[in-house]
């Protein structure tokens, strides 16, 4: 079992390497169709499994297509990680769509809308 510090370092290294792979190495058109960014990586304590959370800025149809492309490219990503990172065993890679940024921007838009409505009602009351 790896220490928490080592797990965090490996997760950060995987995040950086997968980001590079997404930008320059993966040739699948489905992956390039939407703007894809790696938001987080969770690595198991034994360094055998890596959950890679990705944020995709595009339509729902393109998101599904991009996730299918990432799933198809997971073997390539694992092989490249094995060549770039020195680990006894290369972790299994799973891509998971992260919609937290989308939800956060929607909440901010709603808060801005509420703020505008309050300022408008204050002006009307004056």
Curated annotation (Swiss-Prot):
Keywords for this protein: Cytoplasm, Ribosome biogenesis
SUPFAM superfamilies reported for this sequence: Ribosome-binding factor A, RbfA
GO molecular function: ribosomal small subunit binding
Tree of life domain: Bacteria
Main location: cytoplasm
InterPro entries: KH_dom-like_a/b, RbfA, RbfA_dom_sf, Ribosome-bd_factorA_CS
Entry GO terms, CC: cytosol
Bilayer-spanning residue ranges: none
One example of a Gene Ontology biological process annotation: maturation of SSU-rRNA
Self-association and partners: Monomer. Binds 30S ribosomal subunits, but not 50S ribosomal subunits or 70S ribosomes.
Its job: One of several proteins that assist in the late maturation steps of the functional core of the 30S ribosomal subunit. Associates with free 30S ribosomal subunits (but not with 30S subunits that are part of 70S ribosomes or polysomes). Required for efficient processing of 16S rRNA. May interact with the 5'-terminal helix region of 16S rRNA.
PANTHER family documented for this protein: RIBOSOME-BINDING FACTOR A, CHLOROPLASTIC-RELATED
NCBIfam families: rbfA
HAMAP family to which the protein is assigned, alphabetical: RbfA
Entry protein name: Ribosome-binding factor A
